[in-house]
Design a protein with these regions (language model features):
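Glycine-rich oxoanion-binding loops at beta->alpha junctions
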Residues: 55-75, 102-160
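Short glycine-rich or small-residue beta-strand-to-loop segments that form or flank ligand, phosphate
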Residues: 60, 86-93, 160-167, 200, ...
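Active-site phosphate/pyrophosphate-binding segments
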Residues: 186-333, 342, 422-423
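Extended, charge-enriched "interface" segments that sit outside catalytic cores
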Residues: 1-78, 353-358, 362, 378
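Short helix-loop-beta junction
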Residues: 105-116, 120-121, 183-186, 312-323
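Short alpha-helices
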Residues: 159, 163-183, 202-258, 370, ...
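Glycine-rich phosphate/diphosphate-binding loops that line cofactor/substrate pockets in enzymes
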Residues: 72-85, 142-158, 280-291, 328
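C-terminal catalytic subdomain
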Residues: 292-293, 297-411, 415-423
């Protein structure tokens, strides 16, 4: 008896720059006048590694399953997932922040606070090594190597390290890697086999970290493909391994990115979210001198996406805004989410608490999504009255397919905008 599985939604995300046009930071005719340059930029970017990577990974996985890179990532993720209860990811830059963005967007909002059973048997995930924050690093060491308590064979005491080569061999990452690998060696009692099994490295072929895994006997050393900009590592093992370990569906993530690639390649300029986003961003700089950009959202699950976006712009030498609090010199793009994934909360009647003190009488029975929609409308009205330059990216929901679309759209738009600036 076969089981028919329901088809998961693949609704497209949308870009709406109407508020930016209304604020006068860029004129619609100016954006329309960029059509030929946008077509030329698209032709260049179509051949780039940032566009080809998701499609290549999916194609190889479909045709060469056991020999494909994605299969190797999923196999390692499964092994780590079954062996430990916490993974420490060491590294900095946009690649690692991309892994964090996928984790926070696609997993339970309080994944690390849940019991292992409530997490579906998936490990906790912690991040370190992006700055010299002594107390943060010591705090994480307290969790994985608690003082005064012997670490036994209990699965809940076991942990592993994913070490990601820092951009330009970042000293912060190198120092953190040395500290945490020393702690890991102590945690396994110096057992070389266990140590090798608990370490995964991800690096370019030219980075010294690439030699660490084979040096300690580990077979889990992944390479960042040649030609992939360090900023755009979220769809390499940097982002995919950690996401798979904590239970995110990385195949759907890549399918979302591939869907955005198709729209980028095939959609007319006027209906192309990548090209329209790049054109508005570029036009705001040319017409109004606004070169700082930020993302803002009412969803805490998208905060790491905003931080990731700031990094992919700043690591190229551009300027990024400070998020929702950025001033009028920043083009703020709101990430507006449609459906919620969990059961809808409703404002209850006051009951024995009394009535009137909290002034919520008119809201009894309203759902959280209804209140969110009203809050977003107020923000839009406030921005319009203040003349703040904004635009919207409309997300049907937050899931792997949507996040794959969003990340790929923003990476492609960054590359296209860079082409426009250089032209």
């Amino acid at each position: 008896m076969s089981v028919i599985r329901p088809k998961l939604p693949e609704d497209p995300i949308r870009y709406d720059p109407a508020a930016a046009f209304a604020a006068g930071v860029v004129a619609r005719p100016a954006v329309e006048g960029l059509a030929d340059r946008l077509e030329a930029a698209r032709a260049e970017v179509v051949a780039s590694a940032v566009l080809q990577l998701p499609d290549r990974l999916l194609a190889d996985y479909g045709t060469q399953r056991p020999a494909s890179e994605l299969f190797a990532i999923l196999r390692t993720a499964r092994r780590i997932r079954d062996a430990v209860d916490r993974v420490v990811m060491l590294g900095g830059g946009a690649g690692v922040m991309g892994a964090r963005a996928v984790f926070e967007a696609c997993c339970h909002p309080f994944h690390n606070e849940l019991s292992r059973g409530e997490r579906g048997g998936r490990p906790r995930l912690s991040f370190e090594g992006c700055r010299f924050d002594n107390d943060s690093a010591q705090g994480l060491l307290d969790l994985v190597t608690p003082h005064g308590r012997q670490r036994g064979d209990d699965l809940l005491d076991q942990w592993a390290v994913i070490a990601v080569a820092g951009r330009g061999g970042a000293m912060e990452t190198a120092a953190a890697t040395r500290v945490f690998l020393a702690a890991l060696r102590d945690a396994v009692g110096g057992d070389a086999r266990q140590f090798a099994e608990r370490l995964v490295t991800i690096a370019t072929t030219s980075d010294g970290l690439a030699d660490l895994a084979p040096a300690v006997g580990s077979s889990d050393g992944f390479r960042i493909p040649d030609g992939v900009d360090a900023r755009f590592g979220v769809f390499t093992a940097v982002g995919l391994l950690a996401a798979s370990i904590v239970g995110a569906d990385v195949v759907r993530l890549l399918e979302g990115a591939a869907a955005m690639n198709r729209r980028f390649r095939e959609a007319p300029v006027a209906d192309n979210p990548v090209l329209q986003y790049a054109a508005v961003s570029y036009g705001a700089g040319q017409e109004s001198g606004i070169t700082a950009h930020s993302l803002s959202s009412q969803s805490t699950q998208l905060e790491a996406v905003a931080s990731w976006y700031a990094l992919i712009r700043s690591e190229h030498g551009g300027r990024a805004g400070a998020g929702a609090g950025a001033g009028c010199g920043t083009l703020i793009t709101n990430l507006v989410v449609g459906e919620c994934r969990r059961d809808r909360l409703t404002v209850p009647s006051p009951g024995p608490l009394g009535a009137g003190q909290d002034e919520l009488g008119d809201l009894v029975g309203k759902t959280w999504p209804e209140l969110l929609a009203a809050a977003v409308a107020r923000i839009h009205d406030d921005d319009a009255r203040a003349g703040r330059p904004t635009a919207d990216i409309l997300l049907p929901r937050i899931d792997e397919h949507v996040i794959g679309q969003l990340l790929q759209m923003l990476m492609l738009a960054a590359v296209v905008e860079e082409r426009l600036v250089r032209a």
